[in-house]
């Protein structure tokens, strides 16, 4: 369930629901020496409060608080349940007519869990992006070019739309293009390393090239 409100330049939302237990926190699992996997499993009640405020016609700030009432943490045979709180704050601003900048920082209070090589799993992270122009699926020929840097700890966020944005420290360069109405082509390249090792062999390099076409109905 969600309740939203708006007052002048202030927007907000209150949310309550339940997350599926088939996912782990940030979609990240860790390998142990016996070949098994462990992580922080969801399947718990979730509540959040979000606020956004327009400081000016070109700048907005936002903050979110979220709480998972009970997360099941399975760590190398040591299972326990814990409530987890999340905080996030960020902003976006228009630097020039065709240039925008955004940045966000997130953190949770889930700690004391180690990764596949014994290091504590990082529970905070940040993301920033610089974007030239904006694409619009209804505007044929519109495009955007973007670059971003992320340092996203595996326990700094509940989940993301795509797994390759989680537990990653590195750069992305890409573009969006609208070849026909209600269609977008996106191409990007991401390079970096894992924040925490998910394999007993240590942190792995991350190199992703992706091209996709999206349709809007």
Please report, for each region that a protein language model flagged, where it lies by residue.
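Outer-membrane beta-barrel pore domains
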Residues: 56-217
